[in-house]
Amino acid sequence: MFSRSTLCLKTSASSIGRLQLRYFSHLPMTVPIKLPNGLEYEQPTGLFINNKFVPSKQNKTFEVINPSTEEEICHIYEGREDDVEEAVQAADRAFSNGSWNGIDPIDRGKALYRLAELIEQDKDVIASIETLDNGKAISSSRGDVDLVINYLKSSAGFADKIDGRMIDTGRTHFSYTKRQPLGVCGQIIPWNFPLLMWAWKIAPALVTGNTVVLKTAESTPLSALYVSKYIPQAGIPPGVINIVSGFGKIVGEAITNHPKIKKVAFTGSTATGRHIYQSAAAGLKKVTLELGGKSPNIVFADAELKKAVQNIILGIYYNSGEVCCAGSRVYVEESIYDKFIEEFKAASESIKVGDPFDESTFQGAQTSQMQLNKILKYVDIGKNEGATLITGGERLGSKGYFIKPTVFGDVKEDMRIVKEEIFGPVVTVTKFKSADEVINMANDSEYGLAAGIHTSNINTALKVADRVNAGTVWINTYNDFHHAVPFGGFNASGLGREMSVDALQNYLQVKAVRAKLDE
């Protein structure tokens, strides 16, 4: 299926934990890859530092696996502490010499907009790389790339709109504030939306004048490395964006603890987020954390049922359920519960699961063997806890990390499948009698990332939205993102916001200036 260099060997992956590390003295900086849809491209293999692809200091590499075939795609260079050091020094020089933060803000915006245009011109290949690397359906990857393009363009428009204020302190003094960039920002992105999270991280950092050292997820580094080739073409100076591929315990730790990094942004699990928060606190670094979720999706009896079912489908099975804000806890008003279960079961069983390059596929592969095993483990936990398996719960096929859409009924609120984030296409369905009851159930969680409300009564929708503990509430829709709307969580779901003007505040600090005037 794939053409590889002689250094990229076809193997079978039993788990992501089996990623093989190898030493190559002459691994080329690009390898040719032919995609399943017939497109061909050159995949960068190096780290991206100072606007160049470079080998890692130790020449160590690791393999990248295709989740839908369990075959190796290629090897890329593995960054380590000394590579992070080189990237941080490059970013620090770029910040100190003013090549980015010292230029006209309009020029920063133009460069970011140009980067979006270059991605747009190559979006078919980029979407295909995302599907190859992550296993998600090609339709989802195309949607991701469109979101990337729109967000970069939107962010570019904020470049010349970062201002301070003049403060009237009397005739004897002139007082004002200005908002300034922080410096070098460390960014750590997940494997479920590799390129979209790359954009969510770099755009607000760059438009505010910061420089970046970014770690890709070890299982999905390809798309971020590929689009990095467009960074110099966009007019972004050397050292402004640096990409170090590698493992969390090495590269992630080095980024989090580096004294020259002033802020850390992370998307991933709550457990890892807590660790990063504690480590960053030791260096008094700013943090943005977009973490886990166990989001409620509420269906009232007056909802238009067929539309509600489709929204619930999108809420849990989109991106193979590997979404931090997935609507994995569904609550249905008692009077329509049986009818809902009937329609939701049928809709779940009709979903096309399989080859992610097939245009009719809605749910592709899980990203890794490890994640598939975790999901199947939770299916067993649900059965053992006494929940009713309504449909699914089985691996699909013998090759590739596929699982059938899975629905549990007859659940209790203290069950692990209700409380814990599964991060896959597994959903629980519970009945409720009143708005007060469902709000209490929805809020009975350590998380607070998102919620969905389905009703034809706008009063009900707005009142419930106000009382649900969630950073984002969708009404009669779900997983409905827009670059102008902020995204982030409450409680154990994180700190700070992604997207929109709100994201910019995470990358700025306020300076107050007060001058005494001559009499």
UniProtKB/Swiss-Prot annotation:
Keywords: Mitochondrion, NAD, Oxidoreductase, Phosphoprotein, Transit peptide. Belongs to the aldehyde dehydrogenase family. It catalyses: acetaldehyde + NADP(+) + H2O = acetate + NADPH + 2 H(+); propanal + NADP(+) + H2O = propanoate + NADPH + 2 H(+); propanal + NAD(+) + H2O = propanoate + NADH + 2 H(+). The keyword Plastid does not apply. The active site is at E290, C324. Residues 1-24 form a transit peptide. It comes from Saccharomyces cerevisiae (strain ATCC 204508 / S288c) (Baker's yeast). Its EC number is 1.2.1.-, 1.2.1.4. NAD(+) binds at G268, S269, T270, A271, T272, G273. This is Potassium-activated aldehyde dehydrogenase, mitochondrial. The record marks N192 as: Transition state stabilizer. GO terms for cellular component: mitochondrial nucleoid; mitochondrion. The modification Phosphoserine is found at S96, S500. Potassium-activated aldehyde dehydrogenase involved in acetate formation during anaerobic growth on glucose. One of its GO terms (molecular function) is acetaldehyde dehydrogenase (NADP+) activity. One of its GO terms (biological process) is NADPH regeneration. The gene is ALD4. Present with 22200 molecules/cell in log phase SD medium. It is found in: Mitochondrion matrix.
